Structures are given as C-alpha cells and as structure tokens.
Design a protein with these regions (language model features):
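Short, amphipathic alpha-helical interaction segments positioned at domain boundaries
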Residues: 396-421
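Short amphipathic alpha-helical interaction segments
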Residues: 362-376
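Canonical Radical SAM [4Fe-4S] cluster-binding loop centered on the CxxxCxxC motif
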Residues: 34-69, 157-158, 162
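C-terminal scaffold of the Radical SAM
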Residues: 61-80, 89-362, 421
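Short alpha-helical scaffolding segments that buttress acidic/His motifs in well-ordered protein cores
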Residues: 54, 341-346, 402-403
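Flexible, acidic/Gly-rich N-terminal and inter-domain linker regions that tether
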Residues: 1-39, 49
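Minor-groove-contacting beta-hairpin "wing" of winged helix-turn-helix DNA-binding domains
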Residues: 387-392
Length: 421
C-alpha cells in the first residue's frame, strides 16, 4: 500500500533522529514528578536459546551471570525507591524472566515491599507453564504473557522453538491448563513470517479461540538489520505487501461478526469480551512515562529517552559501583514529544484532544499539521470531535505499521550498541 510505504519511510527518518542516543555520564535517571504516574519496567535478558527472528536485548543463559544480574536488578530497584519513585504496576520483560523462577520471585517480592504494587506482569515461554512454576507465580503475578508466536509446528521448527519450547498442541494444552491461575493470561503471537500461509494463520486463530485466553497480542514480524540474514536463512525473505491483508484477517476473526469473542485493546492487542478486567499488554499505552531498569532498558522520562547499557558485565559493574545503568540520552523537542504522544495514544485507539491542548497549548492539527493532514487524507480517522480522535480499520493498520517501524528502529539501536559490547 502506497500510503503505508510513505509512512514507513517517514517513520524511519524520524526514529533514526530521535533514537540517536548520545553518551551520558549521568549517575542516575531523572527523579520523579509528584503529579506523574509511572510504571516500572524491568528487563531480564537471558534465554535458553536465541530465536533467529528476535533482536531484543537477549543473551544465552549462563547461571554465573544471571545470579548477580538479578541481585543487581533488585539493587537498581532500591535506587529508584531512594530517589522517591513510587509504582503501582511492574512489568518484567525479556528475554525469559522465568528462567530462574526463585530469583524472579525474590525480585517481585522486593518490589511489592518497596512500592506496594497493585499489579505485576511478566513474560514467559510455553515450556515454563509447569505446575511448580505456576504455583510460584500465581498470586505474585496478576498478568502472565506467554510467548507462543505460532501454533504451527512447521513454523516453530523453522524458528528453532519446537524442540526447546514444545509443539503447538503442547503449548495450547499448557495455556488452557494455566489460564485460571492468573487474573489475565495473554498469548503473544507473530504474523507475517515469510513462510506463513493464510491457512497457517487461520489455524493459529482457531487455536487462540480454543484457548479462550483473556488476551492475545498479534505482533507483525519486526526484522531489524542484525537478524535479517538469519531470518532469511531460516524462514525466508519478509514480504510486507501482504502484512495488511494478514492483519485484517486477524481483526475479522477476533472482532468481527454479531458476537465477536474479542475487542480491540490496542491496535494489535485483543481482549476477551467476556473478561472485563483483562489487563492490556502495552504498558506504554497506559503510562506515558516509565523508568526502566536492567540491561538494555529504555526509559521515557522528562520528555527524553534514556538507554541502559546493553552489556550484562557492564551492567553488573555499574550497579555494584553505586550507579544506575543509564549510558545514553536523547532529549525530545516539543515536536518530538507531540509525535510520540500522537503515535502512542492512537496506537491505544484514542487520542485525547483535551489533554493534548492542556499539555502543548495548541490543537493537534496546529501542532502536527503534516501528520494530522496525512492521517486525514488516507482515511485513518473514524471519528473526531472536540475531545477525541478514533481510528478506522485502515488507521489501525497504519498504527501497526508505524509501531513496527518504531520498534525496528529501537532494535537497530540495540544492534549497534551490542556490536560495541
């Protein structure tokens, strides 16, 4: 689609600029503002095996590295407490946070003691949906996100996940068995793998419906330059020309018809209509600002992006020296902050125009005339009044494509930083 290609190139230009982190000698992140609500993100980068399509900050699991890492993650958490930060919500991502379950539980328990958390979300893989692990997470974790990616065994073998994390049927059975142990269980899926056919996608959707998961997130394949070669070798070349068609198939199955099983939670997250309390997967939608701890974490604070060291060894050294792990910073201009707000709120399906005017002192159209006109031109806005903007199906896909490119840009920053490690 022409408009999507134009937008993609534009987003790449902007992300290249405002993800261009400059080294910083700051000993810590900025402190909190009294009226601001924050979510805490903690990153655990260790995985049993490294998937060929993934370029998130991750390293092969080595216990001698992981034990001090978890200890230092808890120490960095104490640093935030000493700075005056408070949190009601903690999101632990990876990597595979459950790779050392006792260390993870100790980290969650400390966070609850320090901050009085109301909710904890963490990620895991299907092979960790075992009774001994679930029993430790249940009650500690309100929302569990399971990285399935696909239920198709052919794709799982190409992804090098089948032997490590289990077959599609094994994953489905484990999800069904674990679902009631948590307030919300989210299934993470990926669509538009090079070798994925429409029939494979339809089967994945059928498995989701059978699982009756509280929530499902369908991410488009995000191929950063560092994994392009391994991805092409194992799965083939990515074809973006069919991405929108696959996305609309997902939306139709999950949200279409007279009695749809799911409703939109964000542009790529779907929550079960039968579960009013389902927690949305995207912490960046619910909270505009967030500090991140752990190797490779990205914080958005005080109108700027901060990046933590991508080296596990350097991370441990910095924390043990009494510093936080931040090593880079990109200050945002007012226009950058507007673009970030525009992207994140529309990704969350509704832009709050009143809040925009309070924060920026102008209308959306005046603040971002090019972006606003572009979205109007391509028919991305379904509804607009003095208070809000809502999206059409085309608009939702444009946000999926936009966020895909944003995260590809983030992953490129990770790639470049890891090359220097």
């Amino acid at each position: 689609m022409l408009f999507e290609r134009i937008q993609t190139r534009t987003v790449r230009l902007f992300t290249h600029r405002y993800l261009g982190f400059k080294p910083t000698a700051l000993p810590a992140l900025p402190g909190p503002h009294p009226q601001q609500t924050y979510v805490l993100y903690a990153h655990v980068p260790f995985c049993k095996t490294l998937c060929p399509y993934c370029s998130f900050n991750r390293y092969p699991f080595v216990q001698e590295q992981a034990v001090p890492y978890f200890k230092n993650l808890r120490q960095e958490m104490r640093m935030l407490k000493d700075m005056g930060y408070g949190f009601k919500s903690l999101y632990i991502g990876g990597g595979t946070p459950t790779i050392m379950i006792d260390e993870l539980c100790a980290t969650i328990d400390l966070a609850r003691d320090l901050f009085g958390l109301e909710e904890v979300s963490t990620e895991t893989n299907p092979n960790h949906l075992e009774p001994q692990i679930i029993s430790k997470l249940s009650g500690r974790v309100q929302r569990l996100s399971v990285g399935v990616q696909s239920f198709d065994d052919r794709l799982l073998k190409q992804m090098e996940r089948h032997d490590t994390y289990g077959s599609g049927m094994e994953s489905l059975e484990r999800i069904i068995a674990a679902k009631d142990s948590f307030d919300s269980l989210n299934v993470d899926m990926i669509f538009n793998f090079p070798s994925q056919t429409e029939d494979m996608l339809i089967n994945d959707l059928a498995c989701i419906l059978e699982s009756q998961a509280n929530q499902v997130t369908f991410y488009p394949l995000m191929a950063s330059p560092s994994v392009a070669r391994s991805l092409a070798r194992s799965l083939g070349q990515v074809d973006y020309s069919r991405e929108e068609r696959y996305y609309q198939m997902i939306c139709e199955v999950l949200t279409g018809g007279k009695h749809p099983p799911y409703a939109f939670g964000s542009a790529w997250t779907f929550k079960a209509i039968s579960d009013e309390s389902a927690m949305i997967d995207e912490y960046i939608v619910d909270y505009e600002e967030y500090p991140a701890i752990g190797s490779g974490g990205l914080s958005y604070l005080d109108g700027g992006l901060y990046v933590n060291t991508f080296s596990v060894e350097e991370y441990n050294d910095l924390i043990e020296a009494g510093r936080m792990s931040v090593i880079g910073k990109t200050p945002f201009t007012t226009s950058d902050r507007m673009r970030y707000r525009f992207m994140m709120q529309l990704f969350g399906l509704q832009l709050d125009k009143r809040q925009w005017e309070r924060d920026f002192g102008c209308s959306v159209a005046a603040g971002l005339p090019v972006e606003y006109s572009f979205f109007k031109l391509v028919g991305a806005f379904a509804f607009e009044d003095d208070e809000k903007i809502l999206l059409t199906p085309r608009g939702r896909y444009l946000l999926v494509a936009l966020m895909r490119e944003f995260f590809v840009g983030v992953n490129k920053v990770r790639d470049e930083a890891r090359q220097r490690v």
